[in-house]
């Protein structure tokens, strides 16, 4: 394995639940990163089996919050963590954790979707440029699920920053 992805909203569990701690301990032992899905999800659409069993489709998930991620990082300060979707609507909280912890990264997956849902709306270009300015390209990577490389190519970034985002950060983190 090169890493794991945690989608707490699908399982309805809190990422800082004590039962999850053995997962993070194993990731530390194996020296592999944990990619946390970040973003609000309608329980009905994110978990079809729950909706089929009568779950309220208008109830939003309250698991996988920045506060839970902070608890995990405080408990395991050396755990390699990636925040998917650059933290989505929790961007600034996740950015703060990535600034504080040397081993926290962000990916660029689905930024167009999450950026268009921000108030005020933010373009992918603006979002990536902001993150590079305040976090550094060494901690940002191309997202593996629905990201278009031309979005990064269009940013006002140096060749080194673009190289980091389009592969070098990932190569370093996953030891490829």
Say what each PLM segment does:
Residues 2-3, 8, 16-141:
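Catalytic pocket-lining loop regions of alpha/beta-barrel enzymes
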Residues 11, 88, 113, 148, ...:
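Active-site micro-motifs of SAM-dependent methyltransferase domains
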Residues 10-11, 108-113, 163-169:
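A generic structural motif
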Residues 130, 134-141, 146-176:
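Mid-to-C-terminal alpha-helical segments outside catalytic/metal-binding sites
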